[in-house]
UniProtKB/Swiss-Prot annotation:
Chain positions found as Phosphoserine: S93, S644
Bias kind Polar residues: ranges: 206-224
Region span, Zinc finger-like 1: 390-415
Entry remark concerning the domains of this protein: Each zinc finger-like domain binds a zinc ion and is involved in both ssDNA and dsDNA binding, as is the OB-fold domain.
Main location (coarse class): nucleus
Disease per UniProt entry: Immunodeficiency 80 with or without congenital cardiomyopathy: An autosomal recessive immunologic disorder with variable manifestations including decreased B and T cells, reduced effector and memory T cells, NK cell deficiency, chronic cytomegalovirus infection. Restrictive cardiomyopathy and hypoplasia of the spleen and thymus have also been reported in some patients.
Keyword DNA-binding attributed: yes
Record's protein name: Protein MCM10 homolog
Pfam families from the UniProt entry: Mcm10, MCM10_OB, zf-CCCH_Mcm10, zf-primase
Protein localization: Nucleus
Covalent link Glycyl lysine isopeptide (Lys-Gly) (interchain with G-Cter in SUMO2), residues: K493, K627, K762, K763
Region of interest (Disordered), residue spans: 31-120, 137-167, 179-228, 567-630
Gene Ontology biological process: cell population proliferation; DNA damage response; DNA replication initiation
């Protein structure tokens, strides 16, 4: 009976726990004991659950006093629950339901037998759960080695306590403690809530707002796969890729990771003079830098290995440059405390130097040397972004080590010049017509010069390749065959014309077209198309077009063609003149006078008019030059009005005879007949009918003038409205409307222009850079026996074993006013100009400056060309 009473008390305690979920774990620990005082088998399970809740809710370290066995049991318990929830979701849900006791709470009115039966069911369920836990513990003991081998596949998740503190606190000390691998809690697997990617704020706020959430609700969510290292690492990596690029205002250099702000630089530069590093040499010669508060900026190109003086003190040397002229560097010496403070400064750092002290250079050297006496006079500003090395490769395949300014060009002076020469050589080869290295034997002459023989081996010198020179020689030597220029030579022949010519030359007859049966059937149909085609074929066969051989096309010269054309034009003019003559003769034959009576047969007093006589062609055809009044006879009236009166009717032959008889009688009486002035304007005789018409028109105009104004008013009003509409905002808006694709069109045009101008700009930059290069460092050899310095040693010096040595030299470029150029290894060329004989050398760039077309004022010589022997002759 005592056992039954104990079981009943246990069941009632469990029912009370369901009603009050907050105190369930503490009450289960008090009532679940056996008679002998030992803890029950299920005590460990509930104790672990209770510990997990307190561990989740509170972030203190009060559990450090637990034994190692209890920690392992807790880790085993939570790991088993995690495996159950991940692998078998249904049994896990059943186990949680068993723990929560989904059955409704029984009332006090139930009998003892019913309570005992429920207790037995509960014990059986708990035994089944304990067996499952034992099986999972056996599996977990075999899995640690596998977990250590593949930590990436199945890494232990941090405990819930660490996860919660990590989200709430962001201190670096605490995160460092979390990363310690020696903590045993990292072996435990916590049930973290599911981290939804689109809404991370809601999950964090939910955890912070409800820290006392039970462990059962947390265990149903999946853990997030994002660790702290990944979160910390991603911003760091993204920050490195998006670093701001700063252009320093005073030095003009682009900085990476700048250390000094612009406002601070403005404060530091107030009252101080900025001197470029490349201008220090000129300033030192003209001004006293000791009396000026000046600042300069430069980049550390090279750091010389620290050296020691005889006294034992070490010093270091920096080679500084402002990336404007990389051939001239300034040496900065660091002694004593300055060396100790700044010797760790890395190469490529941009530094500012305040009031540096000038030093005397070595004997024979013109390099500028500076020094500073305090480390605070050097300001480290950041890293130079434009400092780099040449991207080209040497002849031995190794990368070039020359320093370049990446903002200007990625290649050094030597490789730019080599590439320019290479492009020039390719261009000369393309312009030549003969690409062979040697001159053909048939074009070779007996007295070949040394230059021609050298060209046969193939080389490039002076902007001309051997291939182009050989082609020019071959073109000059080859005999030119005179070919008569014809139209067939001037025009490119088509394929049809070429095939036709070959057929005519070979005598191949033209093939007759064979008709198919379908075509014959179509031709037999009574259609308009078939009839028209038959009619056309009948006309063609009748005229002899079909089947007759076509005349061969003759190729004639241009002069013969012009002669033929001229003959045709003359023939046409002759025919036209003959037609005009025939027409004139026909018209004159119609107006023939009848026979005059015998009584009045007298010779005419006046000769016939010259206009009535047509000029006969005598050998030469009539010219068709334009002529004013062509076809108008002499003495005819020319009236330019539409309402001119009709011409006077011509007198008949009888009336003309009477007129002549009257004139003779008047002359016999002694009356003088005055001739009319041919230049006088003949007045038109006014017809009374015309005068009446004019009067009627004037009256109508006066009557309808008022009506016309009324009719014109609507037209004026309409025009005013149209003008007002043209000036309105609506019409102006329509005029100013543009297509919505203008932006795309402009972008396309800009892209095309950029694509076109980009290679030209690069070429211009290369030429500009080569024009600005006045001197180039090179390797030269000096023969002490022969006393000369040159780029290459003579073969005689090598064979006779003269004393010589290789050393660094400077190649300088000069030009003469006459246009001749020269290269010298000395300060000035040691010879006169080979073209004009003068010694007026001037410094010039590596590339000859291009000169465009000259205007008339530049080429005009009012006194003519001045010769050397006539200069100063007027004095």
């Amino acid at each position: 009976m005592d056992e039954e009473e104990d079981n009943l008390s246990l069941l009632t305690a469990l029912l009370e726990e369901n009603e009050s979920a907050l105190d369930c774990n503490s009450e289960e620990n008090n009532f679940l004991t056996r008679e002998n005082g030992e803890p029950d088998a299920f005590d460990e399970l509930f104790d672990a659950d209770g510990d997990g809740e307190s561990y989740t809710e509170e972030a203190d370290d009060g559990e450090t006093g637990e034994t190692r066995d209890e920690k392992e049991n807790l880790a085993t318990l939570f790991g088993d629950m995690e495996d159950l929830t991940d692998e078998e979701e249904v049994p896990a849900s059943q186990s949680t339901e068993n723990r929560v006791l989904p059955a409704p709470a029984p009332r006090r009115e139930k009998t003892n037998e019913e309570l005992q039966e429920e207790l037995r069911n509960l014990q059986e369920q708990m035994k089944a759960l304990q067996e499952q836990l034992k099986v999972t513990t056996i599996k977990q003991t075999a899995s640690p080695a596998r977990l250590q081998k593949s930590p990436v596949e199945k890494s232990p998740r941090p405990p819930l306590k660490e996860r919660r503190v990590q989200r709430i606190q962001e201190s670096t000390c605490f995160s460092a403690e979390l990363d310690v691998p020696a903590l045993p809690r990292t072996k435990r697997v916590a049930r973290t809530p599911k981290a939804s990617p689109p809404d991370p704020k809601s999950s964090s706020s939910r955890m912070t707002s409800a820290p006392s959430q039970p462990l059962q609700t947390i265990s149903r969510n999946k853990p997030s796969g994002i660790t702290r290292g990944q979160i910390v690492g991603t911003p760091g990596s993204s920050g490195e890729t998006t670093q701001p690029i700063c252009v320093e205002a005073f030095s003009g250099l682009r900085l990476r990771r700048p250390r000094v702000s612009s406002t601070e630089m403005n404060k530091k530069m107030t009252g101080r003079k900025l001197i470029r590093l490349s201008q220090i040499k000129e300033k030192m010669a003209r001004e006293k830098l000791e009396e000026i508060d000046w600042v300069t900026f430069g980049v550390i190109l090279k750091k010389v290995t620290p050296q020691s003086v005889n006294s034992g003190k070490t010093f270091s040397i920096w080679k500084l440059n402002d990336l404007r002229d990389l051939t001239q560097c300034v040496s900065l010496f660091l002694f004593g405390e300055v060396h100790k403070a700044l010797w760790k400064t890395e190469q490529g750092t941009v530094v500012g130097i305040l009031n540096a002290n000038p030093m005397k250079p070595k004997d024979g050297s013109e390099e500028v040397c500076l020094s500073i006496d305090h480390p605070q006079k050097v300001l480290i500003m950041g890293e130079a972004l434009d400092l780099g090395t040449c991207k080209a490769k040497k002849k031995n395949g190794e990368p070039c080590t020359q320093t370049v300014n990446l903002r200007d060009c990625e290649y050094c002076q030597y490789h730019v010049q080599a590439q320019y020469k290479k492009l020039s050589a390719k261009r000369a080869d393309l312009q030549s017509t003969f690409s062979g290295g040697r001159i053909p034997k048939k074009f070779a002459r007996r007295g070949t010069s040394l230059k021609e023989r050298l060209c046969q081996d193939g080389f490039y010198y002076g902007g001309v390749s051997s291939a182009s020179y050989a082609a020019s020689i071959a073109a000059a030597v080859a005999p030119k065959k005179k070919i008569q220029t014809t139209l067939s030579n001037l025009v490119v022949k088509g394929t049809n014309l070429i095939i036709q010519e070959t057929r005519q030359k070979l005598g191949i007859p033209q093939k007759s077209l064979s008709c198919s049966e379908e075509f014959k059937e179509l031709m037999d149909l009574p259609t308009c198309g078939a009839r028209n085609l038959k009619q056309h074929l009948a006309k063609a066969t009748a005229s002899g077009i079909m089947g007759s051989p076509k005349p061969a096309i003759k190729s004639i010269s241009a002069s013969a063609l012009l002669k033929q054309q001229k003959q045709r034009m003359l023939e046409m003019r002759r025919r036209k003149s003959e037609e005009i003559q025939k027409r004139f003769l026909q018209s004159s034959s119609e107006v023939e006078s009848p026979a005059v009576p015998s009584s009045s047969r007298q010779p005419p007093a006046q000769p016939p008019r010259t206009g009535s006589e047509f000029p006969r062609l005598e050998g030469a055809p009539a010219t068709m030059t334009p002529k004013l009044g062509r076809g108008v006879l002499e003495g005819d009236d020319v009236l330019f009005y539409d309402e001119s009166p009709p011409p006077r009717p011509k007198l008949s032959a009888l009336a003309e005879a009477k007129k002549l008889a009257a004139i003779t009688k008047l002359r016999a009486k002694g009356q003088v007949l005055t001739k009319t002035n041919p230049n006088s304007i003949k007045k038109k005789q006014k017809d009374p009918q015309d005068i009446l018409e004019v009067k009627e028109r004037v009256e109508k105009n006066t009557m309808f003038s008022s009506q016309a104004e009324d009719e014109l008013e609507p037209a004026r009003k309409k025009r005013r409205e149209q003008l007002a509409y043209l000036e309105s905002e609506e019409f102006q808006k329509i005029l100013k409307a543009k297509s919505k694709h203008t932006g795309i069109l402009k972008e396309a045009e800009a892209e095309m222009q950029e694509r076109y101008f980009e290679p030209l700009v690069k070429k211009e930059q290369m030429e500009e850079k080569m024009r600005n290069i006045r001197e180039v460092k090179c390797r030269v050899v000096t023969c002490k026996t022969c006393a000369y310095t040159h780029f290459k040693l003579l073969e005689t010096c090598v064979s006779e074993q003269h004393e010589y040595h290789w050393h660094d030299g400077v190649k300088r470029f000069f030009k003469c006013p006459c246009g001749n150029r020269s290269i010298s290894l000395d300060r000035l060329p040691n010879k006169h100009c080979s073209n004009c004989g003068l010694y007026k050398w001037e410094r010039d760039g590596m590339l000859k400056e291009k000169t465009g077309p000259k205007i008339g004022g530049e080429t005009l010589l009012p006194r003519g060309e001045e010769h050397a022997k006539f200069l100063n002759s007027l004095k």
